[in-house]
């Protein structure tokens, strides 16, 4: 990738991250345990809140990247992940398919993500998450998640890494408010806790 193209990608990502942040600015802490802080924000025009989880891990960005790029293996630490596979990998971009467990009586969900990885000049790593529901035909027995907008960000802090996981999802179909409200706290907290356990081994 040429320097101009790389600059264009970086600028584009900055705009995308800024738009995500603009949609969800008024963060309120919902849970702060085990060194993991989960905050929620209303998103204009959506019935579902955005979530943000932040924690410090005694690990390296290289190890975190390896754990994330092992797409099928990552299912063991992603909250309520049933199965996950890599559909396509091309340079700094990849496409993944995930099936999720859901509590009865909610129909199981699946999602297709376009992941763009950007290495920052400061040693940070950002993985932009974008839902692409039409990338694959819908699977029988699953409701396709209609929108995913978020990112992972890893920032070196001495011998630790600050990890931020922020997402806003439109899950498709109908979800009881009690289930949705529980998910937006459990998803970042449990995902970060499980990732931390593996990253710090």
Where are these regions (language model features)?
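Bacterial N-terminal signal peptides that target proteins for export
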Residues: 1-11
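Repetitive helical segments and hydrophobic/amphipathic motifs
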Residues: 14-15
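Eukaryotic helix-grip
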Residues: 23-201
């Amino acid at each position: 990738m040429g320097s101009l193209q790389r600059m264009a990608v970086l600028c584009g990502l900055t705009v995308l991250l800024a738009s995500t942040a603009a949609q969800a600015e008024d963060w309120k802490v919902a849970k702060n345990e085990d060194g993991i802080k989960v905050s929620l924000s209303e998103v204009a025009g959506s019935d579902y809140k955005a979530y943000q989880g932040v924690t410090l891990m005694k690990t390296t960005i290289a190890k975190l990247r390896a754990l994330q790029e092992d797409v099928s293996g990552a299912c063991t630490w992603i909250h309520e992940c049933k199965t996950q596979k890599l559909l396509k990998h091309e340079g700094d971009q990849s496409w993944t398919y995930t099936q999720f467990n859901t509590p009865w009586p909610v129909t199981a969900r699946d999602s297709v993500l376009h992941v763009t990885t950007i290495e920052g000049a400061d040693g940070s790593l950002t993985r932009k998450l974008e839902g692409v529901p039409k990338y694959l035909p819908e699977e029988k027995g699953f409701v396709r998640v209609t929108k995913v907008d978020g990112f992972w960000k890893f920032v070196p802090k001495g011998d630790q890494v600050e990890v931020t996981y922020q997402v806003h999802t439109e899950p498709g179909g109908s979800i009881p408010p009690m289930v949705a409200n529980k998910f937006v706290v459990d998803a970042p907290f449990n995902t970060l806790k499980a990732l931390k356990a593996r990253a710090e081994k």
